[in-house]
From Swiss-Prot:
Encoding gene (name): tpx
Primary enzyme class: oxidoreductase
Protein name per Swiss-Prot or TrEMBL: Thiol peroxidase
Cited CDD domains: PRX_Atyp2cys
Keyword Oxidoreductase: yes
Length: 165
């Protein structure tokens, strides 16, 4: 399991660690309108899954904005930003940041995504900063679990993986 720190304190990741080549497991999360959404709702598309501890922090905000801006130029690609923030907070953030079309999804109910992808920080009940790219066939083609929660992911590598997927 990947070693992760949050504000330089070690945390325990819970769930099933995912690797390149794995079939992407389905999960159920909630969108800003409190509707259930699954990974399968986006079958046939490349999915760049951007995972943030909380959308309303500087690094998480930058991560969400950057991936949405970069991926808007990619064909057949959707960016899914997932956190445990309540859907109301996600909706408010998107409005304040001028990103009404960003897809923000909440894993607050039962941590279905976090468990399936091995990114629950047990001590904090937050998701570890990470990125997964799933191709149109449902295979994981890129993974990154950022070792320090306050650091940025490798934006270029993730976008490049989405382009090739």
């Amino acid at each position: 399991m990947t070693q992760v720190t949050f504000k330089h304190n070690p945390v325990t990741l819970v769930g099933t660690e995912r690797k390149v080549g794995d079939k992407a497991p389905n999960f159920t999360v909630v969108n800003r309108d409190l509707e259930e959404v699954t990974l399968h709702d986006y079958d046939g598309k490349v999915r760049l899954i951007s995972v943030v501890p909380s959308i309303d922090t500087s690094v998480c905000s930058t991560q969400t904005r950057k991936f949405n801006e970069e991926a808007s130029n990619l064909d057949n690609t959707v960016v899914l930003t997932i956190s445990v923030d309540l859907p109301f907070a996600q909706k408010k953030w998107c409005a304040a940041e001028g990103l009404p079309n960003a897809i923000t999804l909440s894993d607050h109910r039962d941590l279905s995504f976090g468990e399936a992808y091995g990114v629950i920080m047990k001590e904090l009940r937050l998701l570890a900063r990470s990125v997964f790219v799933v191709n149109a066939k449902g295979e994981i083609v890129y993974t990154e679990v950022v070792p320090e929660g306050s650091d940025h992911p490798n934006y270029e590598a993730a976008i490049e993986a989405a382009k090739k997927a």
